[in-house]
Regions:
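Hydrophobic alpha-helical membrane-interfacial segments at the cytosolic entry of transmembrane helices
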Residues: 2-17
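Membrane-proximal stem/loop segments at transmembrane-domain junctions that anchor or position
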Residues: 15-119
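Membrane-interface anchor segments at the N-terminal boundary of transmembrane helices
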Residues: 97-173
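Hydrophobic/aromatic-rich transmembrane helices and adjacent perimembrane loops
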Residues: 178-179, 186-204
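Hydrophobic transmembrane alpha-helices
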Residues: 1-2, 156-157, 199-204
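Central hydrophobic cores of alpha-helical transmembrane segments
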Residues: 2-4, 168-177
């Protein structure tokens, strides 16, 4: 109860301050609605869609963005059909959870300036293990995958633990899986936000 009151009070105060702040002018028409992320969750791999992102930037109002997203959702569901959508969900869940590196180097501009190791000493040693053209990047991927499989096996073999705490963590993971199936996903990096639940379950 204390946690709920504290969280609710904090949210109300922060929300009030944001709505009444004068430092930054906020253009509400540029807000991206939540349904947009459900829409791109239905793209080819269920991940980021440049086409839909561009539409969000070009449409003039929030309602226009919502209408566009609804139309695209209906179009994509109709195109797949029931069996096609079920198959898509299985494939998307595999993409969401299978990669132990959490999609390291698969996307993102932050690494484009450092794909080739150029450092010295310990810095170079790290770069060889994590950069795209590092000599040991394959070793990193292999070890990360082994670690991930072991973590999942520990969780799976711990099914006999039926305490409230364990069940709460399992429900949190199920909720995370469902969230990523409904919204933007398609790669394991989206699973990072749920890592605390995996690690806690694996350690029990």
């Amino acid at each position: 109860m204390i946690t709920l009151i504290t969280a609710g009070g904090t949210y109300a105060v922060c929300n009030h301050q944001l709505e009444n702040q004068q430092y930054i002018a906020i253009d509400e028409s540029r807000a991206i609605p939540m349904i947009h992320f459900m829409n791109i969750g239905l793209t080819n791999d269920g991940g980021y869609s440049p086409e839909d992102a561009q539409a969000m930037a070009e449409l003039p109002t929030k309602q226009a963005k919502i209408d566009y997203s609804k139309e695209k959702i209906q179009e994509r569901l109709k195109e797949r059909g029931v069996l096609g959508y079920i198959s898509f969900l299985f494939q998307k869940h595999r993409n969401n959870t299978a990669d132990g590196t959490f999609a390291w180097l698969k996307e993102g501009s932050f690494i484009q300036e450092g794909e080739t190791p150029k450092g010295k000493g310990f810095t170079r040693w790290l770069q060889e293990g994590y950069y795209l053209y590092g000599n040991r990047i394959a070793d990193f991927r292999f070890m990360a995958q082994i670690w991930w499989v072991i973590c999942l096996l520990i969780i799976a073999f711990g099914w006999k633990r039926q305490g409230k705490y364990e069940q709460m963590l399992r429900l949190s993971l199920i909720g995370g899986f469902l969230f990523l199936l409904l919204f933007e996903g398609g790669r394991s990096r989206y699973l990072i936000q749920f890592l605390p639940f995996f690690l806690l379950l694996a350690s029990l």
